[in-house]
């Protein structure tokens, strides 16, 4: 497989078996392991900007498509994302890693830190989801309602994805026209591809989670939390809850960004993530 990063590093990609399926992954570099976990309806490509410099900074970087996303298997029954991640780490012979997640990826990272604490050396949680916490923001709930209404309609996929973009790209404080069109189209393409590829998995099973909301104080690894100042109040509340409950956690408020903080304010996100990783080596 030809890959745009192949020119500067030895890149390995492939699949690893999981229960009732397989995960597609890419890995490159040498050094302490860093795993990148993508947001819901997206895939590992959302980390393109970070993958390159992380490899160059002396890390073994791993990114993968979670079950029901990208090039990984469609869900066929109930599953646990945190167990899938540990199966990937086992296959790649990685005893523990720094987990860097966004949204759904943060949710999986937190569950992994609680269910398998020996596999997690640190957490970088962007626009964090937390298992066991429900959405309450009327902005988010309204768009979820519209997504449900779109299911089965002739133009249902297009409408469903557009409401996804309104929630998780534009955010509650901007119109679509206020957002860089390239970002919207990049996320639209990923979300549409995942929805089309994994349509058969809708309703086939549910992710089994640990209910992290009531257990945040149990986390005992260095943690940094990122949230955009243009994101939903639900995400801001999650970031605040993590900062209060996780011992030593630090919060980075990202200006000029909604949910996709690593893509909307890449310079600040990369600077803070680099500083966090450097602090782990001291």
Language-model-derived ranges and their functions:
Residues 114-115, 121-153:
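Flexible "cap/lid" loop of the alpha/beta hydrolase fold
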Residues 247-282:
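Catalytic active-site module of serine/aspartate enzymes centered on a nucleophile-bearing elbow/loop
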Residues 80-97:
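Conserved acidic catalytic loop of the alpha/beta-hydrolase fold
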Residues 188-244, 253:
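Conserved serine/cysteine hydrolase catalytic core
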Residues 154-210:
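Conserved alpha/beta-hydrolase catalytic His-Asp/Glu region
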Residues 99-101, 126:
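Short beta-strand immediately N-terminal to the catalytic nucleophile in serine-hydrolase-like folds
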Residues 14, 19-73, 88:
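Conserved HGGG/HGGXW glycine-rich cap/lid loop of the alpha/beta-hydrolase fold
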């Amino acid at each position: 497989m030809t890959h745009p990063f192949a020119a500067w590093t030895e890149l390995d990609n492939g699949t690893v078996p999981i229960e009732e399926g397989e995960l597609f992954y890419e890995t490159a570099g040498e050094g302490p392991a860093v795993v990148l976990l993508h947001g819901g309806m997206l895939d590992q490509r959302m980390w393109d900007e970070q993958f390159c410099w992380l490899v160059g900074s002396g890390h073994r970087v791993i990114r993968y498509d979670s079950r029901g996303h990208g090039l990984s298997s469609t869900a066929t029954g109930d599953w646990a994302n945190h167990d899938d991640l540990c199966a990937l780490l086992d296959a790649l012979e990685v005893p523990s890693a720094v987990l860097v997640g966004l949204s759904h990826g943060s949710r999986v990272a937190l569950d992994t830190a609680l269910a398998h604490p020996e596999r997690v050396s640190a957490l970088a949680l962007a626009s964090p989801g937390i298992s066991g916490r429900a959405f309450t923001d009327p902005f988010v709930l309204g768009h979820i309602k519209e997504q449900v209404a779109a299911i089965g309609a002739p133009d249902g996929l297009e409408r469903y994805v557009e409401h996804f973009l309104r929630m998780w790209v534009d955010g509650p404080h901007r119109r679509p026209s206020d957002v860089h069109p390239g970002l919207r189209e990049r996320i639209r393409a990923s979300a549409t591809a995942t929805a089309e590829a994994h349509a058969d998995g809708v309703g086939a099973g549910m992710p089994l989670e640990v209910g992290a909301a009531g257990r945040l104080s149990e986390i005992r690894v260095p943690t940094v939390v990122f949230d955009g100042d243009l994101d939903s109040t639900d995400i801001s509340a999650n970031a605040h809850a993590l900062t209060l409950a996780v011992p030593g956690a630090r919060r980075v408020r990202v200006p000029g960004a909604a949910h996709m903080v690593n893509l909307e304010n890449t310079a600040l996100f990369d600077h803070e993530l680099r500083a966090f990783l450097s602090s782990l080596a001291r």
